[in-house]
């Protein structure tokens, strides 16, 4: 595909485009983040993504996939009553890092710090100084490898992780 082709747009409540990005800009930022994740030796390791909807989530999700890690998606806690769900997910999936955006990181850090004795790094991915993507190399993977985990709501019991492979 052409890097200048349309990649993704975000709309406001009226259906008007508020942000739009090309495939090239999405891929470049995702590759850069993928290179950053190499310090975690990411192959098959889980990264918990705690983002609001938007570009930061898309780039982090793709960055984890490009690094051969496993993205674990969850809504960030809106208030203290949602902390037990996040704790349950963290305990179940044992992520190597918690990823979020700069505007959520302080709130999440405050909520989670005392809850689980969290020793996992909380990384605001849109606030990193990332290297150029020119050193990025495609990683091979099997279609049967797990791409991401999607957790159930946990409304009737602890959230359960559903494994989604690259083939799905």
Q: Whereabouts are the PLM-identified features?
A:
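A short helix-loop-beta submotif of the ANL/AMP-binding
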Residues: 47, 54-77, 88, 92-97
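A general structural motif
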Residues: 3-5, 43-44, 95, 119, ...
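Short beta-strand elements of ligand-binding domains
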Residues: 51, 75, 119-130
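Conserved AMP-binding/adenylate-forming core of the ANL superfamily
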Residues: 8-58, 78-87, 133-140, 164-167
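Internal alpha/beta domain cores that form substrate/cofactor-binding pockets in large enzymes
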Residues: 108-121
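AMP-binding/adenylate-forming
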Residues: 70-72, 87-102, 147-149, 163-168
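Conserved ATP-dependent adenylate/AMP-binding module captured primarily in the ANL superfamily
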Residues: 76-111, 131-133
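Conserved pre-ATP/AMP-binding loop-to-beta segment of ANL
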Residues: 3-6, 123-124, 132-158, 163, ...
């Amino acid at each position: 595909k052409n890097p200048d082709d349309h990649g993704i747009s975000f709309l406001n409540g009226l259906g008007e485009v508020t942000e739009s990005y090309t495939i090239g800009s999405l891929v470049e930022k995702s590759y850069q983040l993928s290179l950053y994740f190499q310090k975690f030796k990411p192959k098959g390791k889980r990264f918990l993504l705690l983002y609001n909807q938007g570009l930061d989530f898309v780039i982090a999700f793709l960055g984890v996939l490009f690094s051969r890690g496993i993205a674990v998606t969850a809504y960030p806690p809106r208030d203290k009553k949602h902390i037990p769900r996040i704790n349950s997910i963290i305990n179940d999936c044992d992520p190597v890092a918690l990823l979020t955006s700069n505007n959520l990181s302080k709130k999440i850090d405050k909520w989670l710090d005392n809850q689980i004795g969290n020793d996992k790094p909380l990384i605001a991915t849109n606030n990193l100084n990332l290297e150029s993507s020119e050193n990025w190399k495609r990683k091979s993977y099997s279609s049967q490898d797990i791409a991401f985990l999607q957790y159930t709501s946990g409304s009737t019991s602890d959230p359960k992780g559903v494994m989604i492979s690259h083939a799905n």
